[in-house]
From Swiss-Prot:
Protein name, UniProt field: 3-hydroxyacyl-[acyl-carrier-protein] dehydratase FabZ
UniProt enzyme class: lyase
Gene assigned in the entry: fabZ
Similarity-based family: Belongs to the thioester dehydratase family. FabZ subfamily.
Compartment(s) where it occurs, according to its Swiss-Prot or TrEMBL record: Cytoplasm
The keyword ATP-binding appears for this protein: no
GO molecular function: (3R)-hydroxyacyl-[acyl-carrier-protein] dehydratase activity
Keyword Lipid biosynthesis applies: yes
EC number: 4.2.1.59
Entry's Gene Ontology cellular component terms: cytoplasm; membrane
Short name of any one Pfam family annotated for the protein: FabA
Species, as recorded: Nitrosococcus oceani (strain ATCC 19707 / BCRC 17464 / JCM 30415 / NCIMB 11848 / C-107)
Length: 149
């Protein structure tokens, strides 16, 4: 079982501020599952407009955080790293459900499990909780592809 700090996460994801949405990996079992943490701060840039006076993390960014967790799990499973030639792209989402909003001060716990992989396409289930309460769940697909330049 692996853990990854932010320095290791930066090696496994091509994302950078403001779109790096994983702060820490607290459990990774390659080929099986991953648990990650995203600390939500009032300083997140999306809170300026979503919504003034009532800051709520956009649902699409909650899903993006799940997708980033699946990318880390896929790279750890294949023992590869993102490169200028190829990365994992967010390829699809099914059965996305949102149960409650996420705001400043929340710590999201992202749990993803590998359902199956076939060639370059990977399918995962994912769930997000805050303080043990379900925030969102979805099936996420990612695809290992050559980068588009």
């Amino acid at each position: 079982m692996d853990t990854l700090d932010i320095h290791e996460i930066l090696k496994h994801l091509p994302h950078r501020y403001p779109f790096l949405l994983i702060d820490r990996v607290i459990e990774c079992i390659p080929g099986k599952s991953l648990v990650a943490i995203k600390n939500v701060s009032y300083n997140e840039p999306y809170f300026q407009g979503h919504f003034p006076g009532l800051p709520i993390m956009p649902g699409v960014l909650i899903l993006e955080s799940l997708a980033q967790a699946t990318g880390i799990l896929a790279f750890k499973t294949t023992e590869t790293m993102p490169s200028e030639e190829a990365i994992y792209y967010f390829a699809g989402i099914d059965r996305a459900r949102f149960k409650r909003p996420v705001g400043p001060g929340d710590q999201m716990r992202l749990e993803v499990e590998l359902v199956r992989s076939l060639r370059r396409l990977w399918k995962f289930t994912g769930r997000v909780t805050v303080d043990g309460s379900l925030v969102a769940s979805a099936e996420v697909m990612c695809s290992y592809q050559e980068t588009y330049k």
